[in-house]
């Protein structure tokens, strides 16, 4: 990366995915539009490596996060006569999480301490946008706080901006933040990722994006077989309406080895958060789902993502 392309802020935070492009849109016309809001250090329309035909999405990278914010605040955008959908680009690592491409206005905040009040959450998260609702979850029987909360914003971009940040400190303690998905959204994440053909905002670089032929496979990756939002329990935050612990009603969805990505021992509230009954995370091409924070582990044989490979799918072109 050249000096001019390495400002203080990480590149991932300065990058936008642009979906819904006209097939007539070129790198030049995309650049011409988005450089109205700042200096672009990179701009590319993703194309099929064989036919060179546009895949209908691209990426623009600004010199500063401030310019990204300006572009997002200028929505809606129309490029070559077509309204396009800009979103904060999702990193390679984050793109493996179910629902990473979904547009939501609510976040899950885990690992918060018992003395954390609503004002602590508001004071921290209002820097990202207008907050509509804050819910600190408590045990229905004892009234004791359960160590997590939900925050709802008025704009999905606030959520997108928050989740690409790796570290958040609320009330003096580090916490973990994820998009909050309802049952239907989890099911959508399970089914839609099987053949997205590159329409998602997964893409860290010039090459792959998330698209391709059958990515995320039909062999159990996030679908059926006890995956996140799988078949038996349907997934969802708070299966029976009482918070975060009801991920699959039978423990099959979102199982793990005792914690949600190692940031909170939510399983002590419910057996539903325990080991999976459904086998492996990611079917045949990755390791076990749970245990020691493996839930978000990168699949082995990962290929295509963000590179120049023609397969553009996870698993080095393997099809399930």
From Swiss-Prot:
Residues found modified as N6-acetyllysine: 3, 298
Keywords, sorted A to Z: Acetylation, Cytoplasm, Isopeptide bond, Methylation, mRNA processing, mRNA splicing, mRNA transport, Nucleus, Phosphoprotein, Repeat, Ribonucleoprotein, RNA-binding, Spliceosome, Transport, Ubl conjugation
Post-translational modification note: Sumoylated.
Pfam families reported for this sequence: HnRNPA1_LC, RRM_1
Position(s), cross-link Glycyl lysine isopeptide (Lys-Gly) (interchain with G-Cter in SUMO2): 3, 8, 78, 179, 183, 298
Sequence segments annotated as region (Globular B domain): 95-185
Location of the region described as RNA-binding RGG-box in the Swiss-Prot/TrEMBL record: 218-240
Disulfide bond sites: none
Residue ranges, annotated region (Disordered): 188-216, 271-320
Record-listed Phosphoserine modification sites: 2, 4, 6, 22, 192, 199, 285, 309-313, 316
Residue span, RRM domain: 14-97, 105-184
Modification Omega-N-methylarginine occurs at: 194, 206, 218, 225, 232, 284, 300, 318
UniProt superkingdom: Eukaryota
PROSITE patterns (alphabetical): RRM (PS50102)
GO cellular component, one term: nucleus
Modified residues (Asymmetric dimethylarginine): 194, 206, 218, 225, 232
Record localization: Nucleus; Cytoplasm
UniProt region (Globular A domain), positions on chain: 4-94
Modified residues annotated as N-acetylserine in this record: 2
Modified residues annotated as Dimethylated arginine in this record: 194, 206, 225
Region feature Nuclear targeting sequence, mapped onto this chain: 268-305
Subunit structure: Identified in the spliceosome C complex. Identified in a IGF2BP1-dependent mRNP granule complex containing untranslated mRNAs. Interacts with SEPT6. Interacts with C9orf72. Interacts with KHDRBS1. Interacts with UBQLN2. Interacts with PPIA/CYPA.
Task of the protein: Involved in the packaging of pre-mRNA into hnRNP particles, transport of poly(A) mRNA from the nucleus to the cytoplasm and modulation of splice site selection. Plays a role in the splicing of pyruvate kinase PKM by binding repressively to sequences flanking PKM exon 9, inhibiting exon 9 inclusion and resulting in exon 10 inclusion and production of the PKM M2 isoform. Binds to the IRES and thereby inhibits the translation of the apoptosis protease activating factor APAF1. May bind to specific miRNA hairpins.
UniProt protein name: Heterogeneous nuclear ribonucleoprotein A1
């Amino acid at each position: 990366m050249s000096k001019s392309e390495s400002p203080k802020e990480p590149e991932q935070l300065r990058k936008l995915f642009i979906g819904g492009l006209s097939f007539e849109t070129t790198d030049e016309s995309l650049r011409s539009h988005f450089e109205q809001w700042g200096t672009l250090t990179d701009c590319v329309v993703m194309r099929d490596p064989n036919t060179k035909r546009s895949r209908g999405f691209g990426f623009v990278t600004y010199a500063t996060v401030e310019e990204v914010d300006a572009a997002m605040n200028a929505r809606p955008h129309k490029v070559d006569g077509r309204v396009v959908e800009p979103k904060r680009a999702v990193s390679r690592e984050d793109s493996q999480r179910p629902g990473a491409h979904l547009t939501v206005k609510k976040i899950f905040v885990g690992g918060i301490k018992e003395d954390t009040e609503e004002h602590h959450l508001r004071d921290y998260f209002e820097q990202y946008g207008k907050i509509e609702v804050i819910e600190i979850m408590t045990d229905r029987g004892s009234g004791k706080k359960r160590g997590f909360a939900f925050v709802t914003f008025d704009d999905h971009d606030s959520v997108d901006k928050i989740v690409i940040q790796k570290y958040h400190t609320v009330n003096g303690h580090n916490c973990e933040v994820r998009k909050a998905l309802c049952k239907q959204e989890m099911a959508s994440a399970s089914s839609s990722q099987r053949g997205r053909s590159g329409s998602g905002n997964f893409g860290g670089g010039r090459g792959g994006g998330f698209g391709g032929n059958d990515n995320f496979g039909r062999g159990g990756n996030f679908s059926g077989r006890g995956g996140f939002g799988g078949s038996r329990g349907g997934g969802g935050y708070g299966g029976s309406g009482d918070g975060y612990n009801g991920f699959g009603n039978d423990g099959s969805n979102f199982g793990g080895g005792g914690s949600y990505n190692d940031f909170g021992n939510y399983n002590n509230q419910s057996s539903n958060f325990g080991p999976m009954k459904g086998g492996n995370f990611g079917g045949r091409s990755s390791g076990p789902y749970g245990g020691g924070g493996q839930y978000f582990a990168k699949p082995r044989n990962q290929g295509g993502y963000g590179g120049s490979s023609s397969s553009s799918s996870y698993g080095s072109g393997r099809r399930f």
